[in-house]
Regions:
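N-terminal mitochondrial targeting presequences
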Residues: 16-19
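Alpha/beta enzyme core
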Residues: 25-33, 40-75, 79, 83-104, ...
Length: 283
């Protein structure tokens, strides 16, 4: 390094140092947002550039979701994605994020094979990525697994209500309305040590009651406005997803149309001989 840089480092050098030393949001700080009544924003990400953009935009949490099975791999549901594949995507996301809390889904059936196997799977996720926590689907029936993971030092976000990994048992993606069971699942997850609970596709009134009952943050997806935070699949939010989009999704952009238009324009210009033009050509 030139000696002059030690006294007057270039701007790019300062920026690289600062970006590499920013502290990530921690699990305790994430939990404190409920007490502070600070609404939590979360989105999914599956690759480096998307995760980097979401992090720079200031979301508090990023989930490497098993929805990668649907929106990236093209499967009909979340079941096919494997642990190795989740880790592959989580490693990219973990490398990109400097500020947000990064959570990784435990893919089916990694949390249904006993506590020891669950710890092995979740341990791999944390060891092989720069991510900080795992999410698993389940409430009361997963309490032992949640407690085992937490006891091993692995932060757990629980997921109750509609559980996409149980799509075949449920007979489809249906709103879950059993208030007693939903409340029991959320409280059991909290008691087992979960630091937050995702509430998916449940009536807003039930989500509100759960949010007021448990002390850890609730993250809603199709669960009304009174949850402590909200999460969406980023492909849905950006309007990239094709076909059916759930009712609870709001499209904040229409990138599917934008991308299609850009590619069509490129194709036409190549065929017409107008690309590359002089400004894209070396002399």
């Amino acid at each position: 390094m030139p000696r002059a840089w030690l006294l007057n480092p270039p701007v790019f050098c300062i920026q690289i140092h600062m970006s590499s030393t920013k502290s990530r949001l921690t699990v305790p700080k994430f939990q404190a947002m409920k007490v502070e009544e600070h609404k939590i924003t979360m989105l999914t990400a599956y690759d480096y550039p998307t995760a980097e953009l979401l992090d720079q935009a200031g979301v508090e949490g990023i989930l490497v979701g098993d929805t990668v099975s649907e929106v990236v791999q093209g499967h009909a549901n979340t079941l096919p994605v494997t642990l190795d594949e989740i880790i592959y995507h989580a490693e990219m996301v973990g490398r990109a994020v400097q500020q947000a809390l990064v959570v990784v889904d435990m893919p089916f059936p990694s949390n249904h094979l006993g506590v020891t196997r669950a710890i092995e799977s979740a341990g791999r996720i944390l060891k092989e990525t720069r991510c900080q926590a795992v999410k698993l689907e389940g409430g009361a029936e997963q309490a032992e697994v949640i407690a085992g993971l937490v006891g091993a030092g692995i932060p757990v976000m629980a997921h109750v209500g509609l559980r996409p990994q149980s799509v075949h048992r449920l007979g489809g993606y249906k709103v879950q309305r059993d208030e007693q069971q939903l409340l029991a699942d959320a409280t059991a997850a909290e008691a087992a040590g979960a630091f937050a609970v995702v509430l998916e596709c449940i009536p807003a009134s039930i989500a509100d009651k759960i949010t007021r009952t448990i002390e850890v943050p609730t993250i809603g997806i199709g669960a009304g406005v009174n949850c402590d935070g909200q999460i969406l699949v980023v492909n849905d939010l950006l309007g990239i997803s094709g076909g059916y989009v759930p009712r609870f999704v709001k499209k904040y952009a229409d990138l599917r149309t934008t991308i299609s238009g850009a590619v069509t324009q490129f194709r036409n210009e190549v065929r017409e001989g107008t690309f590359p033009a002089d400004e894209q050509t070396f002399k």
